[in-house]
Amino acid sequence: MAVAAPDLTALALLGQRVRPVSAATERMLTVPGALAGLLPHGGLQRGSLVATGGGAASTLALALVGPTTAAGGWVAVVGLPHLGLVAAAELGVDLERVLLVADPGPARWAASVAALLDAVEAVLTCPPRPVAVGVQRRLLAQARERGSVLVQVGGPTGRWATAPDLVVTATTATWRGLGEGHGHLRGRLAQVAVTGRRGADRPRRAHLWLPSPSGGIAPVAVDGTVSGVGAPSVVDPSAIGPAGRPRFEEAG
């Protein structure tokens, strides 16, 4: 569903139609299993500010909210015109549960995001300019009250007066599938790191398909290859845990 103009009255009325189906007392939004082990609480904590970064910032953000839409919840995307809907669907996002809101402009960004935090379970956006401490406090108070999550997609996290609760970053990304100048890209292998506050002060890392050849996020196979691709993986086998699951590394 698209909202062409960021009219606050229209957003408020829309919010009455798409209020979260889950109770705010359920303090976590479910995330894909391949990412759950990286997060300090195993999911996205309602009322929190999460940022995704690196070359796969959009993929990470979409993957994080995919299970929410699959469970019947709503997600809003504010001012991110290059966010790929085809990629979103491949990552498990139910597009019928996504509100696309045109860029409201810097002057109305905070008010638009606040209206949507009152209506949906997750808002994906990127602040167009530094966010004042008072504005951030109001947005997060709204998120806590309504049980929603605010997700920054790409861009510098320094735009916030207070650092995000979680920062999920994909680095050393390598696309696989092309060979000798021909073939098709089948998936992207990346190291995903999670840092932040409130239980995430010690960084955790894992190598994952982002996305996998079949879409979604998948761990590295137990034999040192990547699930779905027969070619040797560029991942150090020591990063692979039992039963094909990524071995989560804590730094520091």
State what each model feature region is.
Residues 155-222:
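Phosphate-binding/switch region of NTP-binding enzymes
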Residues 117-171:
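A contiguous pocket-lining binding segment that forms or flanks enzyme active sites
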Residues 66-67, 92-93, 140-142, 209:
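Short, solvent-exposed amphipathic alpha-helical segments in soluble enzyme
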Residues 1-77, 222-252:
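Detector for small/aliphatic-rich hydrophobic stretches
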Residues 64, 113, 139:
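Aromatic/hydrophobic pocket-lining residues that form π-stacking "cages" and hydrophobic walls in ligand
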Residues 74-132, 136:
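Long, charge-dense
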Residues 50, 76, 99-101, 151, ...:
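Hydrophobic/aromatic beta-strand patches that form the interior of the parallel beta-sheet core
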